[in-house]
Amino acid sequence: MLFRSVRCVCDALGYPGKFEVLLGQLVNLLRNGKPVRMSKRKGTMVTLQELVDEVGSDAARYTLISKSSNQMVDFDIEAVKKRDNSNPVYYVQYAHARVCSILRRAADVTAEQADEMGMKAVAAKAIGENVDYSLLTDPTELALSRKLNELTDLIASCARDRAPFRLTHFAEELAGDFHSFYAACQVLPSEGRPVDPELSRARLAACDAVRVTLALVLTLVGVSAPEQM
């Protein structure tokens, strides 16, 4: 009855056929893998506000949106509070914060330091213009580029199919590709480990693209993108 009333209101306001009802499945609340027992008769229950107060709005929103509306959600309270890579929301947010840290370090490289390390233009202000992306030939760099190129089509499919959970899967895959890239490829010069200036700029540009993409995806699902963690 309520849905019918809302549909009539939408029709009257000039939006015929625009009202959609998407029903989600049950959420199984767990703590350390064990079900949290609730009972209407006994009055024992956990409200959404209580859940958000305990785990935080980012963890709650990300976990609930990370499944298709056709799937039940197993929400383990202790698991989503963990600050390690086993927690998907932490994993993605940490990747964003790590990229921001790299870009801050690049901005702190002075001209004198850059010259000493065999670099001429490493600072963040030097990236973005006239970058030679053809220098990115490492398999991890290519995998990262391919993943970044999926975003536009992904957003369109999420909107078309009412499937925002795909954004969380994409973010986790992108975070994984970034960590693999950063482990395999030196981005900034260090003492005794110079990097070709143009290659460094290209890698910094790739890092910045990851930052922008992760921030956009997290914003789309209503989750913050911290610059420090």
Question: Where in this protein do the model-derived segments appear?
Answer:
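Non-catalytic interaction-recognition regions
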Residues: M1-M229
